[in-house]
Amino acid sequence: MYQDEIKHEIKTLLGERNGILLAHNYMRDEVQEIADITGDSLGLSIEAAKTDASVIVFCGVHFMAESASILAPDKTVLLPRLDAGCPMADMVTVPELQELKARHPGVPVVTYVNSSAAIKAISDICCTSANAVKVVKSLPESEIIFVPDRNLGRYVARFTDKTFHYWDGYCPTHERLKPDAVIRLKQEFPDALFICHPECNPEVEALADHVCSTTGMYDYCRKNPARRFIIGTEAGILYRLKKENPDKEFILASPALVCPNMKLTSLEDILESLRTMTPVVKVPEEIRIPAKQALDRMLAIPRD
């Protein structure tokens, strides 16, 4: 079946099922192209909760579909590739986090949304890469436990005077971006601005003109008068950056910035998922309710 035929059948089935297709910013180009909404993990989950659709086809990785299930329990959440996981989310387990909490009694746990539902359920509050600084500053305590991303935690710590207990997790894709690669590109393209994600390591962030979330990157590149940007995050972001800014040039900071899990989902997978209405991701209520409380506490913090 040709791609155009697959896309047509996907759209037909979405209509028949009262479905909506959500795609993360790191998905393959052709998946982002047919999505009803593209965005970051939390933004998509909020859209899932707001939509009138009864079926959510979530093109992303497992923890994202879980978040959609947490915020939209009355909807059917499909994850076309159940094997699309997140190594960073898997780096922290419930027993390990409970042990860390026991070593630091009374210290609140701030959990990055790139985490499993089970971890969110034993956390005090969640954060995104965009609002992490604001979330941490909102807490009255002088100490926090930050999981699972050490790089995001270190980035946030620069803007607060709190004591951090980091989990030693990281994103393997962002970790592959090394300072040498950035320095070479900055020398080759001296007029280019380098922007990177806070999941990058601190040595890379130190070279950046701007550090921000994926949503922040779209805004920054659209508003900034510069014509050339070096991009320090997963390659999938280039699709929308180029589409929204056809007169600007975007250079991926390293060919290693490709997440294999984000690239698993194909158009064929989406079609098969809609045909069979599987695989369904459903978070059990005993996990969903406390996990939703951690997300709700974050969502209650006023946005800028």
Swiss-Prot record:
Gene Ontology CC terms:
cytosol
**Source taxon at top rank:** Bacteria
Where is this protein found?
Answer: Cytoplasm
Q: In which pathway does it act?
A: Cofactor biosynthesis; NAD(+) biosynthesis; quinolinate from iminoaspartate: step 1/1
* Gene Ontology molecular function terms on file: 4 iron, 4 sulfur cluster binding; metal ion binding; quinolinate synthetase A activity
Question: Which residues bind [4Fe-4S] cluster per the record?
Answer: C86, C171, C259
Task: Give the matching Pfam families.
Answer: NadA
- Which EC numbers characterise this protein's activity in its record? 2.5.1.72
Q: Which InterPro entries match?
A: NadA, NadA_sf, Quinolinate_synth_type2
Q: How is the cofactor bound?
A: Binds 1 [4Fe-4S] cluster per subunit.
Keyword set includes Acetylation: no
Q: Enzyme group, top EC level? A: transferase
Instruction: Give the disulfide map.
Output: none
Q: What function does this protein fulfil?
A: Catalyzes the condensation of iminoaspartate with dihydroxyacetone phosphate to form quinolinate.
Family designation: Belongs to the quinolinate synthase family. Type 2 subfamily.
Under the heading NCBIfam families, the entry gives: nadA, PRK09375.1-2
Q: Can you name this protein?
A: Quinolinate synthase
Naturally occurring in which organism (per UniProt):
Geotalea uraniireducens (strain Rf4)
Gene transcribed to yield this protein: nadA
